[in-house]
Regions:
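Kelch-like beta-propeller repeat domains
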Residues: 1-329
Length: 329
């Protein structure tokens, strides 16, 4: 059987972009990619500007925003529901973990502080966030007292937090995990829990149950701080850290450049090799900003910046299209 393939395209960039950074976040709304947060120097937030990239003109600009503008932060996440972006948590310049939830209305360019009290997730950074058409999901991360393994949902219609059942002991608290919504279920993939992890867990909101799933095939090696998105019945992952630095977050660990796909129905992993027309592979990196997106009618993974094996922050922009026809997508 021929190997599965994927196509990398390096996107042209014009205008006033975010520059080199890691531990930041992006989200796609319509034909614009929004970027927020991150660091150029380890643990030092760059700024709190909201950068927007028009995919039709390949041009960056700084959004002219109003409202409750979030302070600078690293280890932040964001996800979009409709035309609204939600930003949660992170770590500020004083290395304080944060727990505010902000929304940004892309139709009015207005920030709103949605939640900052005790009714939502505890303060954290380097957690993971994803969304469906009604909820923003927050999982794990680095909390004040250690790594976390809780799953929260923010209902954007009811405007309230929902704390989901706590998973079993097998799902250890972790930072930098993959998180994806696939066919109504929430999947937690890998992450760092003192060591790099290689386990996969699934939460069914309808039954409020957690299951650790056993996968097979070309299983990726244990990793964290990788890029992960859900497309159809698949979870696509790219890159990440496979061996942490002795300097912790101040240094660069060993990164990988591999891409894999997990079929959530068969629970089989397959590696995605570079296909014809794939150019400018991003190479090994982690701590990137990423989002699922659709460009030129193709579903795939948007990837901006990140940290390199030399501990240099990156400022390039890629789109990865997995060629999933061979497995029924």
């Amino acid at each position: 059987m021929s190997p599965l393939r994927g196509k990398w395209v390096k996107l042209d960039q014009k205008g006033n972009g975010p520059g080199a950074r890691s531990s930041h976040a992006i989200a796609l709304v319509g034909h614009k990619v929004y970027a927020f947060g991150g660091e150029f120097t380890p643990r030092e937030p760059v700024d709190n500007k909201l950068h927007e990239f028009d995919v039709e003109t390949s041009t960056w600009s700084v959004a002219d925003v109003t409202g409750d503008i979030p302070p600078p932060r690293v280890g932040v996440t964001m996800a979009a529901v409709g035309h609204t972006i939600y930003v949660f948590g992170g770590r500020d310049a004083a290395h304080k973990e944060l727990n505010e939830l902000y929304s940004f209305d892309t139709s009015t360019n207005k920030w709103t502080l949605v939640s900052s009290g005790d009714d939502g997730p505890a303060s954290r950074s380097y957690h993971s966030t994803t969304s469906d058409d009604r909820h923003v999901y927050i999982f794990g991360g680095c909390g004040i007292a250690g790594r976390l393994n809780d799953l929260w949902a923010y209902d954007v219609v009811e405007q309230k937090w929902i704390k989901n059942p706590t998973p079993g002991y097998s799902l250890k608290g972790r930072g930098g995990p993959g998180l994806a919504v696939v066919q109504g279920k929430i999947w937690v993939v890998y992450g760092f829990s003192g060591v790099e992890m290689d386990d996969v867990h699934c939460f069914n909101p309808a039954e409020e149950t957690w299951v650790q799933v056993e996968t097979s095939g070309e299983n990726p090696t244990a990793r964290s701080v990788f890029s992960a998105v859900g497309i159809g019945k698949y979870i696509i992952i790219y890159g990440g850290e496979v061996d942490p630095s002795d300097l912790g977050h101040l240094g660069a660990g060993k990164f990988t450049s591999e891409a894999y796909v997990l079929d959530t129905e068969t629970l089989i992993w397959k590696r995605l090799d570079d296909g014809p027309g794939s150019d400018n592979h991003p190479g090994p990196r982690g701590w990137c900003a990423f989002a699922a997106g659709c460009l030129n009618g193709k579903q795939g993974l948007l990837l901006y910046g990140g940290n390199s094996p030399t501990n240099d922050r990156l400022d390039d922009f890629f789109f990865f299209t997995p060629c999933l026809d061979a497995v029924g997508y």
